[in-house]
Regions:
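Conserved small/polar residues in nucleotide/adenosyl-binding loops
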Residues: 149-154
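Flexible, glycine/proline-enriched loop segments at strand-loop-helix junctions
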Residues: 36-37, 126-136
Length: 154
């Protein structure tokens, strides 16, 4: 089975849920950018989150850009997505390697302390730009936080 995003709503549209399977997307990114395992996981999380956030956009011409700029060795990461499920991404240092931490890839140390930016271009004169400090640098937690605090009002 290929990649997909599932959307669900409840309470008359007041509650929305999204889930995604993106193994093919992440594998393609790994091959195209010749990424290390830690870069693959980090960019994979951002690609998946960006794809789900892009699916929330209303018009086919809308574009969402998510950027992480941290002080860790992975450098910056950028993902662009749209409501049609088209997504692409870039990682500053695709060859980054760090020792395992408690037997797991250390995404937080690879990303470091930094800022998560969400740019929504919905065809107005200026795009909406929201910046927030990374909370955990694990990417998924940070995307969840920015979605909850900033994007629900827009």
């Amino acid at each position: 089975m290929g990649d997909y995003i599932v959307r669900a709503t409840a309470a008359g549209g007041q509650v929305r849920a999204f889930a995604a399977t993106t193994k093919g997307l992440v594998e393609e990114a790994k091959e195209r950018h010749n990424m290390s395992p830690i870069a693959t996981v980090a960019l994979g999380r951002l690609l998946t989150g960006g794809a789900m956030m892009g699916a929330m956009m209303k018009n086919d011409a809308d574009i969402l850009t998510v950027q992480i700029k941290g002080n860790g060795p992975i450098g910056s990461m950028t993902v662009t997505a749209n409501p049609k499920g088209e997504v692409k991404g870039f990682v500053g240092n695709p060859q980054v390697m760090l020792p395992l931490k408690d037997g797991r890839l250390d995404i937080a140390d690879a990303v470091g302390i930094g800022v998560l930016s969400v740019i929504k271009d919905i065809g107005l004169k200026e795009p909406y730009v929201g910046d927030t400090i990374l909370i955990t640098s694990e990417i998924a937690d940070d995307l969840t936080s920015v979605s909850y605090t900033h994007l629900r009002a827009h």
